[in-house]
C-alpha cells in the first residue's frame, strides 16, 4: 500500500534471499549488487522427532494434550499419516502464497514462476536476467534511484544521511539501520 503513495525501493546488499526477497517483492524497484545472493523463493518445513534422542539420554518427557490435533507440532512422536498430509499441504499452500506475492509484486505470470522459484538461489546478475531485480548498483546508486522515482531533486544537492560503514573496503555497503538511527532522526 505504501508503494501506491510513495515509491518503495528495495536495495539488496550481500544477501536478500527467501524472506528478504519476500519483503522486497512489492517494491517499485529492486536493486541488487551483481553478486547479491537472492531468490530462494520456496518453503521448507522442519519437524524434528526427538523421542529416541531423549530415551538415549535417559530423559523421560511427558506431554499432555487436549484435542485430537493438539500435539501436531510436538517433537515427542512421529507424525501420523494424516498429520504428514496436513504438513505437506501447509507447505504447498505457503509456497503458493509466496509465488503469488512474487507474481503480483514483480508482475510476472504465476504459472511461469516455478523455473525461477522452487527454492532456487541466484546471484544478483542471474536475478536480473530472470526479472527478479530491476537493476544493479550499490547503496549510493539506490539513494539516487529512489530520489529519481520520488521526483526529488538531485540527492547531491541536499543532505541525505548515508552512513557507509565499509568506506575503506568497498562502495557496496550494508547499512545498519540501528546504527544509522541517530542521523536519520536528525534528518527527519
Where are these regions (language model features)?
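Active-site-proximal helix/loop microenvironment
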Residues: 113-137
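Conserved catalytic cores of soluble enzyme domains
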Residues: 1-121, 148, 154
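Short acidic-hydrophobic, aromatic-tinged amphipathic segments that line or gate anion-handling sites
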Residues: 31-32, 133-141
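Intrinsically disordered, low-complexity segments enriched in small/flexible residues
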Residues: 65-68, 72-75, 93-96, 139, ...
Amino acid at each position: 500500500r505504501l508503494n501506491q503513495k510513495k515509491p518503495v525501493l528495495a536495495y539488496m546488499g550481500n544477501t536478500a534471499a527467501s524472506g528478504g526477497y519476500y519483503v522486497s517483492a512489492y517494491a517499485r524497484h529492486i536493486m541488487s549488487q551483481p553478486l547479491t545472493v537472492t531468490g530462494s523463493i520456496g518453503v521448507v518445513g522442519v519437524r524434528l522427532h526427538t523421542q529416541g534422542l531423549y530415551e538415549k539420554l535417559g530423559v523421560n518427557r511427558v506431554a499432555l494434550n487436549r484435542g485430537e490435533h493438539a500435539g501436531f507440532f510436538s517433537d515427542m512422536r512421529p507424525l501420523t499419516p494424516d498429520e504428514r498430509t496436513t504438513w505437506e499441504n501447509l507447505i504447498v499452500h505457503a509456497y503458493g502464497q509466496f509465488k503469488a506475492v512474487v507474481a503480483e509484486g514483480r508482475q510476472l505470470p504465476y504459472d511461469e514462476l516455478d523455473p525461477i522459484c522452487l527454492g532456487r538461489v541466484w546471484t544478483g546478475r542471474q536475478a536480473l536476467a530472470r526479472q527478479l531485480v530491476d537493476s544493479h548498483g550499490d547503496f549510493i546508486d539506490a539513494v539516487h534511484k529512489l530520489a529519481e522515482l520520488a521526483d526529488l531533486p538531485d540527492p547531491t544537492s541536499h543532505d541525505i544521511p548515508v552512513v557507509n560503514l565499509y568506506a575503506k573496503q568497498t562502495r557496496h555497503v550494508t547499512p545498519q539501520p540501528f546504527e544509522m538511527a541517530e542521523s536519520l532522526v536528525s534528518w527527519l
